[in-house]
């Protein structure tokens, strides 16, 4: 007798989930995690400056492009291409967010943002102030970092290729789970950057 049975959709999703768990995400033991975390620390220890193009994907799926500059420790510039009018800078202590079209400036304490993790004077993930988790997904090292005492800052997720060991992407996940993804392209490492690029724009005072 021939049986004609339809496999439930829920069972198909369940089997796909099991497949991805076993074949997509590598099991990472404690020693492997420690070794990979040390690799990330060494990457930032040896990173003096970074200049790169980026593509940003917002939680709604909207994309923006621009240039990013890092000069560690402490200095950051994220300069968006038009039609995005946003400029983000930091020289330590504050993140300055400016809208060039509106000529507006907002200052946010650095330690209230995930950027504080990247801009530390000495990055140490074996730190009671951080909650750190690591996994490998299809050959990509994924490091998830939260500030233990400031959950309002959200979560920073760093993704690295293994060979060569390079930063490819970071994701900022907020308290409600919305993610902003930044893809790094055409990176140049450890080249001298002018200090002045980390200053915010100087908008003229409005006329009374």
Feature-to-residue mapping (PLM):
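Bacterial N-terminal signal peptides that target proteins for export
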Residues: 2-15
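Short, solvent-exposed helix-to-loop capping segments enriched in aromatics
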Residues: 44, 112-126
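A short, Trp-centered hydrophobic/proline-enriched beta-strand micro-motif
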Residues: 42-61
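Solvent-exposed strand-loop boundary residues in beta-sheet-rich modules
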Residues: 58-60, 101-103, 176
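Bacterial N-terminal signal peptides
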Residues: 12-24
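Boundary at the C-terminal end of the N-terminal hydrophobic targeting segment
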Residues: 28-32
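An acidic-aromatic
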Residues: 67-117, 180
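Gly/Pro-enriched, hydrophobic low-complexity segments
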Residues: 126-207
């Amino acid at each position: 007798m021939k049986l004609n049975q339809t496999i439930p959709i829920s069972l198909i999703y369940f089997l796909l989930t099991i497949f991805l768990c076993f074949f997509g995400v590598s099991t990472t033991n404690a020693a492997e995690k420690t070794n990979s975390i040390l690799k990330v620390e060494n990457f930032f220890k040896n990173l003096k400056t970074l200049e790169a193009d980026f593509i940003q994907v917002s939680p709604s799926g909207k994309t923006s492009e621009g240039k990013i500059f890092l000069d560690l420790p402490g200095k950051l510039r994220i300069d968006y291409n038009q039609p995005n009018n946003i400029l983000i800078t930091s020289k330590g202590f504050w993140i300055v967010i400016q809208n060039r079209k509106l000529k507006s400036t907002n200052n946010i304490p650095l330690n209230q943002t995930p950027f504080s993790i990247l801009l530390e004077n000495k990055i140490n993930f074996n730190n009671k102030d951080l909650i750190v988790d690591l996994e490998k997904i299809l050959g990509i090292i994924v490091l998830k970092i939260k500030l233990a005492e400031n959950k309002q800052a959200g979560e920073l997720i760093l993704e690295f290729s293994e060979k060569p060991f390079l930063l490819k992407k970071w994701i900022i996940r907020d308290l409600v789970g919305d993610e902003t993804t930044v893809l790094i392209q055409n990176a140049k490492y450890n080249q001298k950057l002018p200090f002045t690029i980390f200053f915010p724009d100087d908008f003229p005072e409005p006329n009374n």
